[in-house]
Amino acid sequence: MAAVYSGISLKLKSKTTSWEDKLKLAHFAWISHQCFLPNKEQVLLDWARQSLVAFYKKKLELKEDIVERLWIYIDNILHSRKLQNLLKNGKTINLQISLVKIINERVAEFSLSGSQRNICAVLRCCQGILSTPALAVIYTAKQELMVALLSQLCWSACRQPEGAVVAQLFEVIHLALGHYLLILQQQVNPRRAFGDVTAHLLQPCLVLRHLLSGGTWTQAGQGQLRQVLSRDIRSQIEAMFRGGIFQPELLSSYKEGLLDQQQGDVKTGAMKNLLAPMDTVLNRLVDAGYCAASLHTSVVANSVALLYKLFLDSYFKEGNQLLCFQVLPRLFGCLKISHLQEEQSKALSTSDWTTELLVVEQLLNSVANNNIYNIAADRIRHEEAQFRFYRHVAELLINHAQAPIPAWFRCLKTLISLNHLILEPDLDDLLASAWIDAEVTEFRTKKAQEALIRTVFQTYAKLRQVPRLFEEVLGVICRPAAEALRQPVLASGPSTVLSACLLELPPSQILDTWSLVLEKFQSLVLPYLQSDADMALKSLSLSLLLHCIMFNMRSLDSSTPLPIVRRTQCMMERMMRELVQPLLALLPDTPGPEPELWLQKVSDSVLLLSYTWAQVDAMFSLNCSQYHSMSGPLIGVALEISNLPSLLPGVKTQHWKKIEKFTAQFSSLGTYCLEQLYLQKMKRTLMQTSFRSEGAIQSLRCDAAFIIGSGRKSLNQRTTASWDGQVGMVSGLTYPVAHWHLIVSNLTILISYLCPDDVGYLASVLLRTLPMGKAQEVSIDEEAYITLEKISKAFLHSPLFPEMQSLHSAFLTCVTTSCSSILCSGAQRDSGLVSQQLPWLFEKDHMVVGHWENRFAKAGPEGIEPRGEIAQNLLSLVKSDFPIQLEGEQLESILGLLEVISALQLDSLLPPYHVHYFLVLLSMAVTKLGCSCSSSLALKFLTTCYQLLGYLQKGKSARSVFKIMYGSDIFEVVLTSLFRASSRFLIEMDDPAWLEFLQVIGTFLEELMQMLIQMKLSLVLNFRKITAFLSSSKPYTEAASSKQLENQNPQGRQLLLVSLTRLCHVLGPFLKEQKLGQEAPAALSELLQQVVLQTGAVLQLCSVPGARGWRLPSVLISSVSTLLEADLGQHCRDGGADISQGSDRTLLSHVALYQGVYSQILLELPALAGHDQSFQAALQFLTLFFLAPELHPKKDSVFTSMFHSVRRVLADPEIPVQVTQDIEPHLGALFTQMLEVGTTEDLRLVMQCILQGLDVSNMWKADVQAVVSAVTLLRLLLNCPLSGEKASLLWRACPQIVTALTLLNREASQEQPVSLTVVGPVLDVLAALLRQGEEAIGNPHHVSLAFSILLTVPLDHLKPLEYGSVFPRLHNVLFSILQCHPKVMLKAIPSFLNSFNRLVFSVMREGRQKDKGSIDDLPTVLKCARLVERMYSHIAARAEEFAVFSPFMVAQYVLEVQKVTLYPAVKSLLQEGIYLILDLCIEPDVQFLRASLQPGMRDIFKELYNDYLKYHKAKHEGEKRYTA
């Protein structure tokens, strides 16, 4: 046989054997164990290699598929486990260079032509060689082969191939780069490495890195590149450049090329044969032929930033700053923008500008972050070489302004941060192009502009040259320009920045700046305002600057130096006399039909200045007694009517009237400022002692009326504009928002002086401007903006709103009027008839509706019911044909209004409003709904109505409703309406919307009946009427007549069921309580018995199974639970023979029903786990069923059946962990009842199942759910109060349980990743077991097993959520041992501290300051650190036991804390804990630590101990003085 197989070698070499047969023979020889060829692996590999080499050298002709199969054959050998095992066992397999060369040739062919012929197989072979160290040596030994391969691979990738080849290609590139990096590390000839990288690898790798950075292959899709691999390859390329181009050995060459040329002193160094490395790199970089023209600009730009970063990483250190700078101009010269001349901005596209400016930003940031630019050193030693370069960059940026690009602003910001003198010569152009004349609209660009302006102002504030800066700003503003095209000078960003800067300035600089603006205004603008629109716009810009300066200066006060006060007072007087009054004089006495633009802007300007002056004047007068206002004293003066405060001093009232008429022609900034002036006047009036005089009150009313009336027209336009809150941004478009904001912000002042018409108008505006539809998506930059909707919504939810009684009442009226108008619009009859039938819809005065209670009330003592005319009227309308029908659009409108009503405090309404709202809401709820209303919309509407009725009836005035309507009549009206409406609902019974609706209806009806009981309102009468109504209702009569189920209304049946159930739920407990106090009325007991029978009949009808797969409806489960509770309650309560027999018969008559539901619930319990209410109701039923032995089936044990059903719930893998945790308390209540009533044998069954589940073999079988369910059952069991034989049975099993938990935890912790679904519950139940104390676990060995569990649980490499879940559980176990096992702790303190130290060190590791990443995980670490601090306090409380170990605990802490830099909050908590341990250390312990700690640790301990003495011990010593 061996002879046959040995002939294979000859057949492979034979020319007569077909290639098909050769390949089959070769494959067979490789896989067969009976083929005894000498050195078989080498022979077969050489045969395939020789065949391919012969083919590619044209010595052999082969078909294409044969070539492909030969490559695949080599690939199979290279990737086979057999070959790997042979190599691992030391066998040598030689790859010939000829194979490697043809691989390189094929890759080169692919890179040049893009031909993918055989390329996948070739790449697989290459990957097989490179991934096997024993084979890869052929590449690593021949560096030129690796360089050639890597170069061609990168060029291949640069062609941007697609399809399956992508992943394979980049896998090989990743491997090749890894090997080449190892070669570079071992390279002893830096010149060779530099030459290889720059000549062969620099260009393709730069292009490849650019493409990878742009995400060319990382989009989702088949054959695409993984992001992790992309990031790794980019990192490898950077490492290759660092190791090849920027080697430490080349530093002298870089110095020769960069520094010596500059100094004219050419020196020869050790590397003199290597010519200018920087020139070599840059020439290769800017060469135009290595990539497409469309890519060249961006490749060069991105590469410039990379090369400079790598240069700094390699060579930057103290003393090399000049060298690192000299590279910068050379690299900057590679960018296109460096060669731009004047007026050549358009030579580059926007995308090119963006790319290159981003690179310039990176370069400048590198300079700033590494402190390369030292101003003094540059000036003294280097003749301002750096300064001149930065000036060149600054001129380039200023001359080619690119305001739409955020990076342009950031570059300028960095330049001014380096040295303000860089931009000082172009300061005016900078301010013009970056601020005054810049057109900035995009959010990111606004933020960049804001940061630049902030830096400019902060810089000049530090230099105390803000007046100089403002001189430049004023110069730019006053330049001739098309002002209408300019953006507002103080939009939100610049205004915020300027305000923050001005607040920090000393008063003298503020006053200098103020004076400067005033002078410029007077000299350059004021004389030329007449009929000049541009000048008028300039005046507005200067007014805004003045407003910002005056509003953001520090207020004068009693501590302000007198010269500053006097100068400020002079400035105020000068401004009024020389600026405000002349500007006011420019406004016409008689306004024309349409005011000119210049007049509008002048009026805006002067009114802004007037408002500013008045506001600042009032502030100075209030805060500084040395300031004497031109307006006279502000407070404490009793004024005559003729001397009431004016708007401005020196301006007559008649002149203001003319100004009012003029500004009334247009809504703009001037109108807003005039309103502010009137508001300021009101405040001044209120500060007088005579503000309550008739004249003062009349003046206040007139002023308030003016403020409200001036914007009435604009508010009616319903604008959707948004306002940033800055005065300068008030315009015709944003004025309504600013006006409404002014009113709402000052309503506390205005509301007392408004007439009823104005109050009603404000209420209507508030309602009209509230958002009633879906919230629209808002862009990031508009989030902080103010809109009408935001203002109104905030005011509606404000606690001040209900306090403004007049406005609140008017708003309530508006809402009911709007609701009533929509309802009346759906009237199907004559409006006169409807007004007679539903008069409250047409009554706008709540008081009239509220007084109906007097009209309908009986004469008699409190508690006697009134007549029910309203209810009877409503009932007749509901039964016959309700006169109102709403369609879809009307319903949507009403839903919006209901949303508004839900925001009101319905529980605090006064009786008149309460009654009116109740009637309106009830009318809505019983209204007919048209065909255009979908079932979902109708359900949403009804649910909302009854929710609001429920909220209303929880209020303080709920009793007032029962003065005009019987409770039973309300019940009947509601259900009659709902029974009729339910027939049109095309909706599934288990639809969440329907179930929510049933819940809301049930809650409303139950609260209604509870209120009847609380108020003791004719209980027998009301409940008899309710019971009679339900028994005569259509759904009940249909059910009783046993008609065909499909012809009946299932929704109506469920409504009836909910009503009966809630009736049982109310009457049952009430009668039970009555039994305790006094004899329960027999009539109510009879009614309850009747209701129970009715409920049982309906339930039996509803519980008839339908089609296959039928499930219990959730409503039925809760209803049957209530029925059983009522049945059992009657059974236990009734003492009389007759009633007792009747209740027995009732209970027995429902046995089949209860048993059927019981069986169905046991089957469905796992499915119900995801529905909280249904699951609770099911468990409640099972609890009640378990407590009624007469209902138990005779065949099976109820305990066993229920227990196995609960086990199925816990063991169901489809139930999420969170759901299991949520239902655990409910299961615990059932379990407690079961074990309390159950026998010892029942408990033994439970214990047996728990121990089976805790068997470690379940982990080996990967049956995690069985383990988790057993642990959960054990936790439930431990929470049950057991005694006697049951308790001893549990404690006897504790050792076995602890051992099982130890094994389970060990298995779960060894899995990768750690099985936290097992570890977490195991720790929980272990803590619960340990908390039972030494009576339960008496053997110290079993407690010590807990320490082994704690040490086994891994705390490394956990996600933040996982860490936050595991850590507290570990802490709980430790705490349980410390608190509950004092005897064990006497000998186990080292084990305890070992486990505790793990927790401390893990907190240090997680709480260290990381180089990158957010601090989102910090709250989790802080919680864990607090637990550590608490444990330290518990240890310190046991001083006698732990005193000996305290120095070792401190030493461990110091040892670990020196390894990390902690977040301050984490460090503070840990230090507070270790201070408590230091309290236990005596002086010899401290001396021991100082002597034994290593030097580095000694310093940390010294600092720690000093802080301890300073902050902790001193504080506690101080406290002891006051301790008795």
Curated annotation (Swiss-Prot):
It is found in: Nucleus, Nucleolus. Essential for hematopietic stem cell development through the regulation of p53/TP53 pathway. Keywords: Nucleus. It comes from the Eukaryota. InterPro entries: Ribosome_Biogenesis_Reg (IPR052609), Urb2/Npa2_C (IPR018849). It holds the Pfam family Urb2. GO terms for biological process: regulation of signal transduction by p53 class mediator; ribosome biogenesis. GO terms for cellular component: aggresome; midbody; nucleolus. This is Unhealthy ribosome biogenesis protein 2 homolog.
